């Protein structure tokens, strides 16, 4: 069985976020910026032109990335309209138009010259969101500073009105003199933001080579400790105690960390309170963490963020620094880091499950109180089997085979259940039907997937049945069993066994695929690959690839989709082969 994961966000989550609007008539670039920014702590929308942007703009938009050179309604027009409407949003001009002194009086907040990089776009958006909370005079200073920086890239003699740059600098000095203290404080705040962003990028790069959970945790501590005083990773044991599994900074030894102090950051459910800051930690704990260097610092603070993936709590990261080392922005970014680490741990476990020569198989008995599928089986007095499940942020999409009841009856019964948001008949046969339903009331399956397990089988008859999970051999099986059996009533583990996988070589996979592909399909696949058609953004359009092959775009798509289907079928046919019998 295939277990999928989706990173889709619920409407409620997106509504609570800050909104970034990308405006560009180059749809590929606009989509690329959205792709870069997706998954950050804000919602991203696109407008493919000035008119579309004016229709979308309202007081819910926080940051606008705005192209200047667009047909009909230019970026300059959009910027003017934003200010005339009195919309309180930050605007970054993002354009290939080389800056000149005409920009001095334009009321933007930042100016980016294309081509732009992913890090440049992300950092600009993050900074502008922070600047939104600045006093108006301080915001004006940073906007003027951005204008000066854009013009500094030009030779003064080439500027249309060189004296305008001199006037700008005089104005910049005057604004700074008026708000000197506030500007210094905000500069320090932005500096911390930039250092934390750089730290996150360092962690992302370092995690690429980490292959186990232990490696991930130690790598994170090493990178974080390079930028701060020290860092430790904590895990909550089955007995409810805290255990330090990785540490770095000042020669810190995980075994020597007294964890009673940090325990305050954990709730009764064992989850860390995200962004919990200890303003000044006790002397004994300082000495344990910082050793002989403890006396060199006037005071030390600690930031505790959870390491989690969806609903799965892996532990916590504790970062130590000087007392003023953390603010709301850096705490929020460290929370993102905790989520990144949790995602990395989950992905590592999933890879080891996928690539391991052996896996651990866990079998559970489930009763009618285990979830909506068990209750549906009982209500219809029928047999259900789970064919596939996709993890969504707001629940699961389940594909089930129904025997002993029609697909229409199953859909009707599912719709009557308050825990099912959507149901449809996929295929209705005489003896068996296939139904898709979406629900947030399958906590057992959601918990298993979030812990990195693969749902192999779920069979139910008249309300009860068995659930079979596969999990990596080196995963924390005890934690998984505890999480699954406590996710819902009527669930108990009945068997645990190690299963050897059948091994097929890469050559056998290629032979299986070659036997299915026609010469034309193989050529279309290879040409699309080497031409960059599968890259983001695309290196070649479908029209360009089709032209190189001497075929029409519709014919290209027909061959390409057929070849992709055969490739995917071959992959999953091998992936889902039953374990070899010994």
Swiss-Prot record:
Residue numbers of 4-aspartylphosphate PTMs:
67
Keyword vocabulary terms for this entry: Coiled coil, DNA-binding, Phosphoprotein, Transcription, Transcription regulation, Two-component regulatory system
Task: Describe the disruption phenotype.
Answer: Cells having transposon insertions in this gene are hypermotile.
PANTHER family in alphabetical order: DIMETHYL SULFOXIDE REDUCTASE TRANSCRIPTIONAL ACTIVATOR
Q: What is this protein called?
A: Putative transcriptional regulator HVO_1357
List each copy of the Response regulatory domain by range. 19-129
Q: What does this protein do?
A: May be part of a signal-dependent gene regulation cascade that is relevant to swimming motility. May be involved in the transcription regulation of target genes.
HTH bat-type domain location, by residue? Answer: 517-569
Locate the coiled-coil region(s) and give their ranges. 165-203
GO: which molecular function terms?
A: DNA binding
Give one Pfam family.
HalX
Name the source organism: Haloferax volcanii (strain ATCC 29605 / DSM 3757 / JCM 8879 / NBRC 14742 / NCIMB 2012 / VKM B-1768 / DS2)
Enumerate the Gene Ontology biological process terms: phosphorelay signal transduction system; regulation of cell motility; regulation of DNA-templated transcription
